[in-house]
Structures are given as structure tokens and as C-alpha cells.
């Protein structure tokens, strides 16, 4: 577990003869530091983008926000701790699409319905990459799809570990395009996938743009298509989405801020306003787009409907793959 103080923001005490404890009690929330639990390791994609959000929230609320990294179990360890925290607003946390896959895999009984949502701030999207070293080389996604259809089971596709978010993306791509491939799942969330493709051990792979960017720029892999709802930010905005080519394929991982259930309404309102203002900061928008994600703010009311739709698609994919073990 890593604990890092993002920023220290002072809060003034009431003047006069009132003692420190009385002054703190008289202040509106927050009157002490807030903990933000993040279910991935420090430096991971999700961690990198939640930190500047919390830095801005800290400045807006006048209290430090302490990031506590608790990776493991597909982020389920962190989710359990957030859910079980005292609902006073002093423990909040990070969430992603793994909150859907965890329950469907039987890893955790919790899902996104079991938390207080405070706003979503960015969306990670997977891409399809092709090796420049393998025997089968492709310049476009259409070439890769055509080859897979003409040679069932011959295209080697590297994916994230079974059940991981980018594995779900790969299954969505395979099913949506109607191809038959030889999948090669790799440990973790996608870094090994890129290494396999770059080394010529797989023809194509599905990974995050952030994980593949250096290999794309170095020429070891080619960026063929995006599996998200929209195209990647510049300079990759000329690369098509698979959906715009006529295939019903889409998968994204939205990151959001949440807290335990049953938080006081006034505390929720304070946090929601701070998260929204932090996320809409022009400098944060620029940072998000430069970090190979798509910036977007989704208010709390929009998170559950969006995840309900995505959950239905994931459930079908996992059922077909024989790994549906929905926790009760």
C-alpha cells in the first residue's frame, strides 16, 4: 500500500476565543483531510489521471486529499474498502469498468449500484495494433479482418488476461466482426499484449493507446483501429473506429469518483460540485487528452444508466466464453 499526500491546503480557524475543536465543529464539510482509495498501482493509467482531479478537489475544498493505492483482485480490494467506509465524505475512491467485470466473474458481490457516484471524468479506450515483425502483416484493420475471415483460426491475437477489461474489448471485436482467431491471453491489463505484438509473437493485439504509444511511435507496431465510441485524439484522429466501418463493436472504460452508500446529501452535493469543477478545468482537459484518453464529464445521474448498458454487453460476452460466474 502506498500513501501519498497530493497537496496540502490550509483551512483557517475561526477567530476569537473559540477553541480549535469548536471551530472545526462549526465549519461545514470538510474539516479534515479526505482519503481517496485507488485500486491500481501508482503510475498506472487510472492512477495517473485521478491524481490531478484530486489535486484540484483539494484546492477547491481547502483540505488535503490523500491518495491510497490498493491494487489487487481487479481493483476489488479497493472497492470493498470504499464500500465499507464510514459514509461521512472523508473516504472516497476511484472506479472503472472493472467494477462491472468483477461481479460477473464472481470476484466480488459489489457493483456500481452499491456506491454513491460523484462524477465521471475520463474514458480509456482500447485499440487494435498489428505487428511489423510477424509473418502476417497488415496496414489496415480491413486487411486484418479479411485475412481472419479467409483463414479461420490462423490470425494470432494477443489480449489481456481473461476477464480483464481489454480482454472483453477483444471478445467484442471478434464477435462484432464475425471472425475466428487464435487468442493469446497475457497476464495483466495490456502491457504484455503490446510486447507480444511488438516482438512478432502475435499478429495483432488489443490494448490501451497509452500502453502502445511508444511502440507505435517507434514503428514496432501499427495502430489499425479504435474500439471506442469515437476516434482517438490528435495526432491519431485519422485512424478509424471499427464501428464506423460498419461493425457493431464498442468498448470503453470510464473512470469515475465514488463513495460508500448512504452519504449525507449535503456532503454529496459538495463533492459532486468540486469534482465537476475540477474535471472541467481547461488544464485538466488538456492533460487528459494528452494522456491518450478521451476527456468527458458525466454527472452522477448518467453513470448508472451508461454502466447498465455496458454490463448487458459484457454479460453476454462472458456467458459465451463460459466464464460468467456472477456473484450474489
Residue ranges: model-predicted function:
Residues 24-114, 154, 177-206, 215, ...:
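N-terminal (or domain-start) structured segment
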Residues 41-43, 97, 132-137, 160-164, ...:
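Short coil/turn segments
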Residues 44, 48, 73, 164, ...:
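Soluble non-cytosolic domains of exported or imported proteins
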Residues 59, 81-90, 103-192, 242, ...:
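Hinge/capping helix and adjacent helix->loop/strand transition within the periplasmic-binding protein
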Residues 97-107, 167-176, 203-237:
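A ligand-binding cleft/hinge motif common to bilobed small-molecule-binding domains
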Residues 123, 211-280, 309-312, 317, ...:
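C-terminal lobe and pocket-closing loops
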Residues 269, 280, 285-306:
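Mature extracytoplasmic/periplasmic domains
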Amino acid at each position: 500500500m502506498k500513501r501519498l499526500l497530493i497537496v496540502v491546503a490550509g483551512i483557517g480557524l475561526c477567530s476569537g476565543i473559540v477553541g480549535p475543536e469548536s471551530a472545526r465543529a462549526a465549519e461545514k464539510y470538510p474539516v479534515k483531510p479526505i482519503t481517496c482509495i485507488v485500486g491500481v498501482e501508482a503510475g498506472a493509467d487510472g492512477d495517473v489521471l485521478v491524481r490531478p482531479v484530486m489535486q484540484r478537489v483539494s484546492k477547491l475544498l481547502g483540505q488535503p486529499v490523500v491518495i491510497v493505492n490498493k491494487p489487487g483482485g481487479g481493483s476489488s480490494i479497493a472497492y470493498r474498502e470504499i464500500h465499507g467506509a464510514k459514509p461521512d465524505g472523508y473516504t472516497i475512491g476511484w472506479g472503472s469498468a472493472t467494477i462491472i467485470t468483477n461481479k460477473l466473474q464472481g470476484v466480488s458481490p459489489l457493483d456500481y449500484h452499491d456506491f454513491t457516484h460523484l462524477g465521471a471524468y475520463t474514458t480509456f479506450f482500447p485499440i487494435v495494433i498489428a505487428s511489423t515483425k510477424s509473418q502476417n502483416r497488415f496496414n489496415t484493420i480491413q486487411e486484418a479482418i479479411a485475412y481472419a475471415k479467409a483463414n479461420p483460426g490462423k490470425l494470432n491475437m494477443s489480449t489481456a488476461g481473461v476477464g480483464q477489461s481489454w480482454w472483453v474489448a477483444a471478445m467484442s471485436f471478434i464477435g462484432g466482426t464475425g471472425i475466428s482467431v487464435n487468442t493469446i491471453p497475457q497476464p495483466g491489463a495490456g502491457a504484455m499484449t503490446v510486447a507480444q505484438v511488438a516482438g512478432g509473437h502475435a499478429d495483432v493485439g488489443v490494448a490501451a493507446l497509452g500502453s502502445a504509444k511508444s511502440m507505435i511511435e517507434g514503428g514496432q507496431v501499427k495502430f489499425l483501429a479504435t474500439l471506442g465510441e469515437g476516434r482517438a485524439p490528435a495526432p491519431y484522429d485519422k485512424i478509424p473506429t471499427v464501428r464506423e466501418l460498419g461493425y457493431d463493436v464498442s468498448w470503453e472504460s470510464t473512470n469515475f469518483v465514488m463513495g460508500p452508500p448512504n452519504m449525507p446529501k449535503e456532503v454529496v452535493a459538495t463533492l459532486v460540485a468540486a469534482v465537476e469543477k475540477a474535471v472541467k478545468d481547461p488544464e485538466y482537459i488538456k492533460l487528459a487528452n494528452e494522456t491518450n484518453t478521451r476527456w468527458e464529464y458525466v454527472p452522477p445521474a448518467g453513470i448508472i444508466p451508461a454502466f447498465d448498458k455496458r454490463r448487458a454487453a459484457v454479460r453476454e460476452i462472458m456467458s459465451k466464453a463460459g466464464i460468467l460466474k456472477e456473484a450474489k
